Every structure is written in C-alpha cells, then in structure tokens.
C-alpha cells in the first residue's frame, strides 16, 4: 500500500471566523480532492529541524487542488497558534491527505442525516452540509450546533443560509445565550436532544464531532434515545493542537 505523500501547500487566503479561529484556503498541487467529512495532516518544521504534526478537518469537498480548512486556536498548542496568529497569504505549509473513510457522507446514501457539532467540530459537518446542499438531494438533513456563545460559532452566517437550502439548524449556547434566544444557556439535555434531532424511527445516520467529552456524552445520549450504535459516527479531538 502506497503511503500518502506530504505535499507543499500555498496559503491563498486567510479569513477570520471568530476572535480565536480562522479559515485557510490552500492551493495544493497534486491534491486529489476530498470527500465530505475527511481531514488532513499539517506538518510544521522549525529551523532546528523539530517537527510537529496535527490533523485538521476539511471544510471543502470535491475535486480540485484548493482546500479549505478552519483552525480554532488551542492555548499552549504547538501548531494551532501558528496557524491562527502567524500564517499569512503567500506562506507555505506541508499537508498530507485527504485522510479518513469512516466519517464521510456519500451522495448516493438515501439515509436521513443528523449532524451534531460542538465548537470547531462544525468543520467536517459543514463540509457534509455543503455537499448535500450542492447535490440538491431530498433526504432530510438537520444540524444541531453547540457553542459557548454566539461569537464562538464558526461559519455562523453560512449555517443560517443553509436553512434556506433544506438544512435546518438548532443552536445550543452553553455559556451565554444571545438576546431574544428562545432557550436559556446550558448544556443540552437528553429530552431536548430527542426533541431537536431526527427520531430513531427514521433511522438517520448521525455524525457527531467536537471535543472528546462532548462527543462521548452526545454519542451515549443518542444511543440511549434509541439510535443503533452502528448508525452513529464520531470524530473527536483532544486538547493538544
């Protein structure tokens, strides 16, 4: 089996998403395209030869040599502070990918889809939502997005636009709810999760992405609500980044 090679990536654009997150659009000669939900590895090499690698979800999808990803800065991390604070258009990075076949959505799957994101876990789910909107398929899609507060949401404007393209969104604000919100701030309860997501009777595929504790608690909750474990796909990230 041929190893996936490292490729040089030219940073084309850098766009702030929140006070601590940015999107990067890369031009990657030799990139083969990606499926909705895949990720890549980024490698940084210091002047003394020290290397650090981290995985990041891909927000874009499909063929071509342009890749969009979003990075949320982790305090004390080796890679994310550089990508959020230092990288500029014209810089070069090393990337490897696309990676992952499990956490992907395929257009020919007729199953309803429930997307559940915590924080920057929205990135691969946005890729899936973009792909579904572009395909114009008829199966039900829903998104539940949990963030600390409205300013912490990545791609908030685009997510709202996706409502008009058949992907309704439920917002969960865990620390501070915006003025006029119908829901007080706090974590989602099992009863609320059952009410806001596609029911088990419709046998949806469920994609959950976010911090490890969020993913584990949410996966346990949807299984407790009656969803078969084999219909639940998870992707998680820890503190180092």
Locations of regions flagged by a protein language model:
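FNR/FR-type flavoprotein reductase catalytic core
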Residues: 2-3, 76-241
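Ferredoxin-reductase
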Residues: 2-91, 147-149, 173-176
